[in-house]
Amino acid sequence: MKDNERRILLGRVVGGFGLRGEIKMESWTEPRDAIFRYQPWLLRSPTGTESMLNGARGYDTGKRLIATFPGINDRNAVEAICGTEIYVPRSALPPPHPDEYYWVDLEGLQVHTLEGVVLGSVSHLFSNGANDVVVIHGERERLIPFVQPDYVKSVDFEAERIVVDWDPEF
């Protein structure tokens, strides 16, 4: 597996909510309010300034994630941190369940067909609502449903490879 101490982007401050320093956040954890379990956070401002934060609290309204940060008590303070990204070390995340993967761990792996044709490497993944989709950059970009065992036959972190049942012409 890759370096456990690399930083993983979990979310971002997107704006203020009300006048008392509440913060609208974007979270890429699942469920999205799980981001509060992985503290302390490394905050990185849009200008590149970094700081540590512990003690953030929040809740999911169903439409958005709302948070409070220690020391942020009014809307002006929130506006000053808009765009700030929230990171944690990879080691802060619990081990995934068998046959489940963190997307970040799949990024960079080479993708091979059953016949041994190299399609490229994993750029990123996204969810289309029905399933996750792996985006592969190679001779051209390919999008393959990350569905086991239909399309994804194996993931081998030691060999840094994913094997898929996919027509290389498609």
Curated annotation (Swiss-Prot):
One GO MF term, please? ribosome binding
Q: Which residues form the PRC barrel domain?
A: 97-170
Q: Name one GO biological process term.
A: ribosomal small subunit biogenesis
For this protein, the record's Pfam families field holds: PRC_RimM, RimM
Quote the subcellular location field of this record.
Cytoplasm
**By its UniProt entry, which SUPFAM superfamilies does this protein fall under?**
PRC-barrel domain, Translation proteins
Q: What is recorded about the domains? A: The PRC barrel domain binds ribosomal protein uS19.
Q: How does it assemble?
A: Binds ribosomal protein uS19.
In Swiss-Prot or TrEMBL terms, this protein is called Ribosome maturation factor RimM
**Phylogenetic classification of the source organism:** Bacteria, Pseudomonadati, Pseudomonadota, Gammaproteobacteria, Lysobacterales
Gene, per the UniProt record: rimM
